[in-house]
Amino acid sequence: MNSTDLYEIQKLLYLYCERLDQGDFPGMAELFRHARFVTPGDAPAAVCDPAAIVEMYRNYTRIYPHTGTPGTKHVVANPIIDLAADGMSASCRSYIVVFQGIEDFALQPIIAGRNLDRFEKVDGQWRYTERQICTEHYGDLSRHMLREFGPGSAAAPAAPK
């Protein structure tokens, strides 16, 4: 793996976080145009369409009108990237922690877990082919989610019909 490949894959990880935190669901979903997006939960669903990913996030994520954002900071850490021998595909496992801080809600971690990603290089550009979100730790999601989510809830983001 050369340093350019490593940088371009890491950049995709960071763009996901940045776009979510900006409330740019269409921009975030576009990163997965050629990917299978697997949601967390007891019955995970695979979403393979950017419009469906946008709908899913809009159905579950609270956006604050005065900022147009969810008031979050997604932090990706410890990415371990493995490049295939031919240099045309890669996998990555990383940690994700989401912090939220808004006017009446002190800054705190609200959810954490792992992302399991796959990538391919097409025409010299890296792109996602799969993202699997594995949620492992839950904090106070009351200011972040529009629907019940987490241990004991009946809901986890499912693919829209």
Where are the language model's segments positioned?
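Short, low-complexity N-terminal intrinsically disordered segments enriched in polar/charged residues
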Residues: 1-31
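A structural signal for alpha-helical segments
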Residues: 1-4, 45-48, 107
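Short acidic/polar micro-motifs centered on Gly/Asp/Asn
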Residues: 5, 33-35, 110
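Alpha-helical scaffold segments in carbohydrate-active enzymes
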Residues: 12-15, 59, 118
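A solvent-exposed, acidic/Ser-Thr-rich amphipathic alpha-helical stretch
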Residues: 25-96
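A beta-strand edge to alpha-helix "cap/lid" segment located at domain peripheries
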Residues: 66-161
